[in-house]
């Protein structure tokens, strides 16, 4: 894979990806670029279209993790020219335990099945096995009918609202939240890209993120605490974890005001 650990500090100066530094990481050993479309810690929207073009110029395929982008912005995998694009169901208001893998047909044809079972085999004998056509060769056994139906309904729901409308509304909320939270004494926000997603990670003074999250929960305010499955990034920033507020299409400015008031109330306890 791309040796991101070698140059993470250079690539992510200012907590935004630098394309010229990114290109320096390619070598003859690079086999796949795997990158998040939107950071689930910083909210940074990575320039994946340009990253894909660079990788393809080196003959390297690209997998985009779209878990943090699919619910929040329009996505056109053909325009991006992504070889693979993946996302989880629950991030887009669907059920847990299900997700989507998009792949270019040329790549999916090359890849072997990762599971064996009913429907993924066309013919089988003791001497030879012929796998089924796409997409069935990757769908062994009884499918998750309930999960797939619920996920399809969730995608229909956000599509009916309009992804452009969702993106514009959430950007307005994010700008409002960033400005409001910066007014709080001792506030440190991690990830301040100009065009970022609605993910705001922060610490306040010397208050431990677990303490802040627990007390906000007592006030009826839902946030996430910890390293958010991004422990190497936390080490790079010299912290153990953050409090993370995540904005969605259902949030309001009044709720952001309640979050800010809750943080201020908790801060007075320390």
What positions do the PLM features span?
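Single conserved hydrophobic/aromatic residue that forms the stacking wall/gate
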Residues: 1-12
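Hydrophobic beta-strand scaffold residues
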Residues: 6, 62-63, 189, 223
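Active-site phosphate-binding strand-loop segment of PLP-dependent enzymes
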Residues: 14-67, 71
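PLP-dependent enzyme catalytic core of the Aspartate aminotransferase-like
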Residues: 24, 152, 213, 218-222, ...
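Active-site PLP attachment segment
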Residues: 79-123, 127
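A short glycine-threonine-serine/GTX helix/turn-capping micro-motif
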Residues: 121-125, 130-145
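Conserved small-domain helix->loop->beta segment predominantly found in fold-type I
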Residues: 139, 158-208
């Amino acid at each position: 894979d791309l040796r991101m650990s070698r140059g993470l500090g250079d690539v992510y100066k200012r907590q935004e990806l630098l394309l010229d530094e990114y290109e320096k990481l390619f070598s003859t050993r690079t086999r796949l670029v795997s990158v998040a479309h939107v950071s689930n810690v910083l909210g940074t929207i990575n320039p994946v279209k340009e990253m894909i073009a660079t990788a393809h110029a080196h003959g390297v395929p690209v997998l985009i993790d779209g878990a943090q982008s699919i619910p929040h912005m329009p996505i056109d995998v053909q325009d991006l020219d992504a070889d693979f694009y993946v996302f989880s169901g629950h991030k887009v208001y669907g059920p847990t335990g299900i997700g989507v893998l998009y792949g270019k047909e040329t790549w999916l044809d090359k890849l072997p099945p990762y599971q064996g079972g009913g429907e993924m085999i066309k013919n089988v004998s003791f001497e030879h096995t012929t796998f089924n056509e796409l997409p069935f060769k990757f769908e062994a056994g009884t499918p998750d009918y309930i999960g797939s139906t619920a996920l399809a309904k969730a995608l229909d729901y956000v599509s009916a609202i309009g992804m452009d409308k969702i993106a514009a509304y959430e950007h307005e909320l994010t700008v409002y939240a960033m400005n409001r939270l910066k007014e709080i004494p001792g506030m440190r926000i991690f990830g301040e890209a100009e065009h970022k997603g609605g993910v705001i990670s922060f610490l306040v003074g010397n208050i431990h993120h677990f303490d802040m999250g627990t007390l906000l929960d007592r006030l009826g305010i839902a946030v996430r605490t910890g390293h958010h499955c991004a422990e190497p990034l936390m080490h790079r920033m010299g912290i153990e974890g953050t409090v993370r507020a995540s904005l969605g299409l259902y949030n309001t400015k009044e709720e952001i005001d309640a979050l800010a008031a809750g943080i201020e109330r908790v801060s007075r306890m320390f």
